[in-house]
Every structure is written in C-alpha cells, then in structure tokens.
Amino acid sequence: LVHHALDGRPLTRLINTHSHSDHIGGNAALKAAYDCEIIVPAGLHAAIADWDEDALLLSPLGQQSARFQHDSLLGAGTEIEMGGLNWQALAVPGHDMEALAYYNPEQRILISGDALWENGFGVIFPELLGEADGLTHAQATLEMLSRLPIDIVIPGHGRPFGEVDLAFERAFRRVNQFRNNIEQLAWHAIKVIVSFAMLERRSIAHADFPDFILGLPFAVDVNARFLDMPHDAMVARVERELLLVNALKLQDGKLLAPG
C-alpha cells in the first residue's frame, strides 16, 4: 500500500501521532524497507525505548507490533515541516495521554490522529485503566481543537473530512454521554478491542470464542471494574452485538472477521 502511494518517491520520515499498535505496527517494516527516520511524540520515549508492552497497550489489548527504535522526538509546541508546509505539534491527551496532533494554520488542516474522527474519537483508554482522568482531558482536547480555524481534518481512521463543526458537535455529544454513563464507555471499549483483535486473528472456532475474549486482560479488567457481568454473559453479549452490526460473521462453526 505504501509502495503504491509513494509511486517511486522516497519515504524519508515516518511521524507518529501516538503509540497504539494500529499506528506504530508498521514502523519496523517501513524502516526496514525505506530506512526512513522514525519520529514519535516525546512523551513516548521511554515506553518505546524500553519496549514496555503494558505502557504501549500491546499485552493488555492482545495486540502485536514489531519492535522498533525511534530516531527522534517531537514535543508539543514545536513545529515540523511536512509536504512543504509547517505544522504545529499540539498535545491532544485523552485517547492516549502522550498523543500529538499536527495543525497547519495557513491551509487550515488538522492531522488529528485518534483525538477527533468524523464520528467521534478513539476509545478513552486512560479513563478505563485508572491511569488518568481521560474524559476530562478528552473534553479539554476537543475544546482546544474546536477553537482552531479548520477546513479539513485528516483523522487516524476514516477519510479526510470537512464540515468540521458537525464533527465537533458529534464528538462533544459523545464525550458527554460517556461522562454521564461510564458503563457505556466501558462496554463500547470492550467491543472495540474484541473487534480489533478479531481483525488480526481473522477467524476462530465458535467454541473457542469465550477463551479468546477472556484471554484479553483489558476486557476482563474493564468488565470487573465497571460492569461486573458474569463472564459467560459478557461473552454472549459481545458476540450477539458484534454479529448484529456485521463486525463478526458466524459461518460453518467459525466466527469470522469482516473482509
């Protein structure tokens, strides 16, 4: 995919917004293929240098990423040139407490990572892990970003989008829902993590699905902390709701990820 997008051009730098596996999982392969410089948010230095799988949320979420070493760090408040434009690095804690977004005021473009999507934002993991007041930080991040003149957002997931005011309305509404109902956030997070783990696994025997879910430390811990559902009830509800939205498919005794 990257080779096709480059169309013969060199890849000289790889700049991350945050450290979750779906954003850093290709770093090692791209470094090997293109010998590009890897730049990460400054707050991630120790976690990446020591390859702390708990801090990187690899082990807790049942996810994988090939180990890599970064070449340089980027701190909030600094500027970096990308694509002939100067971008401001902005601290956007919430989904990831060390995350950065990148903003170009001349073209009014925001590279938001998972701090803002067209319909919401990434799971607020710190709130659920008891590490920080993630929802308060997410609210403050949205308030800060909403004050910027923005015409186009390039999110960490989904297509670039305009109509930014509507996206902020949806995001604020969602963060308020979660603040008023932490159990809703907890359940949403469990489903997201199981869906993501299944995208990597691709298929699993239906009979093995309970052990698969209960092998995800995050799902078990969040259920115990916020929901207190019996394990069999949690597994059955996850399966039922993911099948309902076509995030899973049951076929020939197997549960299959889409695609």
Tell what function each PLM region has.
Residues N86-E183:
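Metallo-beta-lactamase
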Residues V2-M82:
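Active-site HxH/HxHxD metal-binding segment of metal-dependent hydrolases
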Residues H3, E143-S146, R240:
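Surface-exposed alpha-helical segments enriched in charged/polar residues
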